[in-house]
Amino acid sequence: MKDARRAALAALVCAVAAQGASPVLVRGAADTRALTILQSELQRNFQTLKQQPSPAYFISYTLHDQRSTRLVASFGAVDSNDESRNRFATVEVRVGDYDLDNTHPIRGDSRAMGPRVTRVALPVTDDEQPIRLALWRATDRTFKQASEALTRVKTNVAAKVKEEDPAPDFSREDPQTYTGDTASYSLDAKAWEARLRRISAPFAEDPLVFRSNVSLSVDSDNRYYTNSEGTQIVTGDVACRLFIQAVTKADDGMELPLYQSYFASSPSGLPDEKQLIADARSMMDMLARLRKAPLVDPFSGPAILSGRAAGVFFHEIFGHRVEANRQRNVDDGQTFGNKVGQPVLPAFLSVVFDPTLRKLGNVELMGHYLYDDEGVKARRVTVVDKGILKTFLVDRAPVKGFTRSNGHGRAEPGYVPVSRQSNLAVESSKSVSTEKLLDMLRDEARKQGKPFGLLFDNIEGGFTNTGRGSANAFNVLPNIVFKIYTDPSRQPELVRGVDLIGTPLSAFAKIVATGEKVDIFNGICGAESGGVPVSASSPPLLVSEVEVQKKAQSQEPPPILPAPRQVEKS
């Protein structure tokens, strides 16, 4: 998911704590001194810039106060222990008016757009004069860049044919005021180092595991947002993430990675050390099985995607295509651009995005937030209702027919917000038991004259291309796949070496049923506005036809030298 129009590998991240040394989440009343400084300097600068020949009509300041702790261990030893604290502001200035401003796409030369925002480092303390000086310099620079960009925009608009989508460049939204608690944490790093050593140690027992690590990241982010329309937002969040990964290699040189992830915002939702060690050993067992698993040739036929795999599938091939900014871009494929009010999925499926949800069942969702990165209140959005496309995920850059944001303008700190996904949920009115779904898979394989169907049990991520310049296709990267034979007496067979490929409209049309048990994918999605936390939940999907291709394969053989024997500890 690095860029939705380019390779965009999902970087799954997770959070964990254990008994005795859990990171402690601390919430306190918001310190509004930083917000007061931002507001004062913003108003001072806005009063001057709105009087210029090409006047500024909008300014926003976002201050992020961040602290991060990252611990990494591999094969029973600590690799790194890093602590950081930083504070910075992102300055946006818009010149022109709500209908046409400096952010308007320049058709035929996207490189001519220039920078939209300026990121500037700030003191980590609330020293007013240094902060104001930094904001003043950044605002002046951003205004000059915006003024030059508006000149290019007006020239481009005059020289090109009339646009298909004449929507305004910026939506008018109601000012919001919200002052939430700020967040911080305390962490016993030494205790966690010992814990990560123990969790990572089992991988040293297998000499064919070439790379492995266990990483813990604990991050706090206190955000202060204000704009010239009167919006003032203060929010604070802490995220604890733990990531277990290991890589082995088959005899033919194919690298076989596996990942396990956990996420929580407080210790109460996190597994203990015993469970984590058990998960690490289960991963080792699966790696050993994968080394011996046969390769699969390119195949076209029926398949089941597990709930988690289906979540990634929908995130990649559906979610990116309903982000409104892709409907504005003339270079985008605009898969659903003119399909509002029309069927785009089977009638038994609905898709919602709900950033207001903190949990689904007992699982915390990474895509939760109260206000988006443009200061708009988060809300539940039903994008597809019983198969019919109803709307898009909209930020403050409207598209034809949708003139207001629905709270999905998102960005990694320091980037320009665009419409992005939050907590995706696939809902089905045609669900069956796991046993019935497997029977339906076998029946579909028999009908097509296939000896087996496929079960995609786990997916590490994927990428999708939504542009017009190349195939409007997706590539999803499974790492645990089984053959399900039409003969029910034959056990499922673990296989390796395939990627799931296809085009979106064809794939959606071939979903024929779903299972009952909903599973959840939590991860970081990267696109134009950087990496943002998301989740995707779905029941298992039965698809009448999928296509798989051979996975890219390393030509480097396994090591010739034997691995050193494990050191006996007295």
Label the model's feature ranges.
Residues G20-R380, D385-I388, G401, F452, ...:
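Active-site bordering "gate/hinge" segments
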Residues M1-A4:
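N-terminal secretory signal peptides that target proteins for export/translocation
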Residues L258-Q260, V394, V495-D499:
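Short clusters of small/polar residues that mark proteolytic maturation junctions
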Residues E427-S506, N522-E528:
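Hydrophobic alpha-helical bundle architecture
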Residues P175, L258-S265, Y415-S422, I484-E493:
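Short acidic (Asp/Glu) and glycine-rich catalytic loops that position anionic groups and cofactors
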Residues V383, K390, E493-V495:
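Local beta-strand/beta-hairpin segments that build beta-sheet-rich folds
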Residues I388-E444:
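C-terminal, non-catalytic macromolecule-binding modules
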Residues A8-Q19:
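Bacterial N-terminal signal peptides
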